[in-house]
Amino acid sequence: MTVSHHPTEELILSYASGALDEANSILIATHLSLCSECRDIYNAAESIGGELLDDIDTAEITNTSFDEFFSIIEHLPLDPAIKPSTSLPQNTFLPNPLRDYINFSNGKINWRWLGPGLRYHSIEASSEFAKVGLLKISPGTKVPHHGHSGKEMTMVISGGYTDGIDKFS
């Protein structure tokens, strides 16, 4: 797969620092799994972050530190949004970071019909302002006119489309 559009360095750096919400992290992690150019930027950001952590003064650990730590993590809620996938449908390519978020039923993705040639699969991800989903668009299908509120990021996993200005594949 040839990657022709890339997330901004700012998004990659935010992902590397752990500052992105889950919805945007899914997109960036999926992109990084396919794009060595952006993966190099990510790896450099992680190296810089590691160097910065090395320069931080260490904190004193008391006799009760470990007990306090384990008390905190014992009370953390489990994240129900991440569900391990079952078998991947035949002839379907899904990058690993995305695969764990897909709900399969009998080895198939549960697509919701949106119109002729249009299917949608919602992905649960915690985010205050973003949604994640898969669109399956049959060749030659025109996407109905629709509005956008906020910022939209799209990642083409297979095939391609044009919006009248740019071609995405």
Tell what function each PLM region has:
Residues 135-139, 147-163:
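Short, conserved beta-strand element in jelly-roll/cupin
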Residues 109-139, 145:
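A short glycine-rich, His/Asp/Glu-containing loop-to-beta-strand
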Residues 1-8, 23, 34-40, 47-107:
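Positively biased amphipathic helices and basic secretion/translocation or surface-docking motifs
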Residues 42, 143-145, 164:
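Short beta-strand His + acidic residue motifs that chelate non-heme Fe in jelly-roll/DSBH
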Residues 13-22:
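Short Cys/His-rich Zn2+-coordinating modules
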Residues 11-14, 122:
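Conserved beta-strand positions that form and line the central face of beta-propeller blades
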Residues 27-32:
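Sequence/structural segment immediately N-terminal to covalent heme-attachment motifs in c-type
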Residues 163-169:
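Short acidic-glycine-tyrosine-enriched beta hairpin
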